[in-house]
Amino acid sequence: MFSLAACSNTQQNDASDSVSSEAPSQVAESTPAEGTETEGSNILIAYFTYGENAELSDDVDASSSASIQIFNGEVTGNTGVMAHMIAEASGGELFSIRTVEPYPNNYNDTVDVGETEKNNGIHPELATHIENLDQYDTIFVGFPNWWYGMPMVMYSFFDEYDFSGKTVIPFCTSGGSAFSDAVDEIKNMEPDATILDGLHIGSSSVTDAESRVSEWVQGLGLSK
């Protein structure tokens, strides 16, 4: 079961995709290769979320930003909540993607940093690293949609790891732009990985998405 502190300001998203309209849950147009077998996989859920990468105080008010969530007493973000739901449904292990340089605690400043990173092709340095990638054959990869695509830290992540022969399953949160070009970008960076159907959930719907996430994981054949 989940313990969440929901947020009241729905005008802000997990950082920003520069879209204020809310979109329903959406499955990306990527399909498994014929004969793909995922049952019994060793599963990792790697995710980047604003709330775990910002300079926030321990007593941060989650209601001050729709990008911040309190999950089981810990500060996270919308994508982090979704990652925990996937872990609960699949029995997979969680891996939080962290940057060396934290993002600002001010929402608008973070939006500006994200835009600067994208416009200048900056790949932020990673502070956390997967030490035992070989033991996993299925990797859920989650992120918010920032500026109509993946945050640039995700390019750092895919630069660092070769997922050849593994199954990669994207998931994301946003205010309305869903995956944008993220799935195509992942396919380009990991041409020898199998990319399965991804799930997008609107930022304001994340805290109520446990059943939707569980059904999706079950549909992939990855329920614990």
Predicted regions and their residues:
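Second-shell loop/turn segments in exported
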Residues: 67-76, 141-144, 170-175, 200-204
